[in-house]
Amino acid sequence: MEKKTLILLTVSVCLAVLTGCAGLRPAPAKILPVTVEVASVERLNAIAAKPPFNPTDVLVFRVNFKLSNPNNVLARVDDLYFEAKVEDGTPEKTIVLASSMPANAILPGGEITWSPTEPLLYGGLLGTFLTRGVGGADGVKGAIRKRDEFWTDLGGDKKKFSIDGNVTTSFPGFPELGTVRNQFATEFTVPTL
């Protein structure tokens, strides 16, 4: 009997120490959005310095994001979508990288990094330039000329990236608070290889 009482007392004390000190966190009043910072943009390969280029030539870019949770509870990034665009003489710019991050959790006060990578195909740019009228009145010849100029400048790290996106945050432990959607935008120049 004494042994059972001692075991019960020991278990009770251990539970009190483990759960009593931590306590339950109160429900937050509102969701602070996860902050998104572009840590860097990298070009991962070199290309020929000047035309003629091969239609299968690729440039591979990686954008390194740092996501921070300013909340004191676990935050879930339900969606993060971004587009990296480069000036091409049109208001829309040329999209060189676009991606969406799958859902991810970030610990209270924690950080994670996300580094999407995507190839940009030289041959694919011509169709994009033609449909958007980048070649101007010169049509196909103008689009080919503009594509070669664009590709040369891009490979020489002479272009500035415009990165726009949005992130949706929620609290898995407090679904009644809903979600918060936050937009972000920045400009970045690729450092030379």
What annotation goes with each model-predicted range?
Residues 88-141:
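Intrinsically disordered, low-complexity Pro/Gly/Ser/Thr-rich segments with frequent PxxP/GP/PP motifs
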